[in-house]
Each structure stands twice: as C-alpha cells, then as structure tokens.
Amino acid sequence: VNAPKSPYNLIQETVQYDPWRVLVVCIFCNLTKRVVAEPYMWQFFDRWPTAAAASHADPAEIRDMIAILGLADRRSKTLVKLSQAYVQWDGVDVRSLPGVGEYAAAAYDIFCLHRWAQIPEPKDGALKNYWKWINGKEESQVA
C-alpha cells in the first residue's frame, strides 16, 4: 500500500516503495530546490540503485557528481554513511540513521509508515503541503 498521489507530486511519492530512497531524496533536497537537485538524484540512483550498492560507493565519486549542488563533501559522506547504516538497520528508529533529521524522519513517517495522521505538521514547505492535503483528504473521506 502506498501513500496517495497528491497534486504536489513530491519526489518521495515516486520512490516511496523504497524507504532508503525516500531518505536519500531528503538528503538531496535538504537546502536545495527540487528543480536543481532532481537530475543529480536520479544520476545517483542510476549509479547506486540500492543501499547495499551505495554503501560501497567512493564518497569522492559522489562528491564530484553532485558538486554543483553545494555541500557536496558533507552530502557525499552522509549518503555513504546512511547507506552503510541502512543495510545494518533494525528498522526501529529512523532518526538513529546518519543524515536523518526532522525533514527526513517526517517523510519516512508519511511515505513509508503511512503515519501522516499521527505526526505533527512538518516544517518543510512541500512536505507540509502534502501533510495538509492528505490529512484533509482523510477527513473528507470519513465525513
């Protein structure tokens, strides 16, 4: 079961079948506009399609690929650390994974656990719009 598609067409909606990808999208979109980050994110997924593959990536190769986005050194190291931790992860506390802050945790709760009604309103603008939309939709379906 997937979270419903919204008129906002968030990238997380497209990759929600893979929780690792949801988290990676959040790292790419953190402090970077979607329109700028998206092409590089898809290049990343083409090169490293799974957490297991990305866990063996050379951070320098990722850094060179995403240099234009800014924060490339930090992001590249975080992507590898996240992937390494993810393949070992017990699935309990997503916030324990490297690079997972409030934004990524909220996206994970919404798109992977389908807990949009149980979490507080996210602070991220696009995620907040989705959260409002889906919670409004839930209420109108019940009424």
What would you call each of these model-derived segments?
Residues 7-143:
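Catalytic cores of DNA base-excision repair glycosylases
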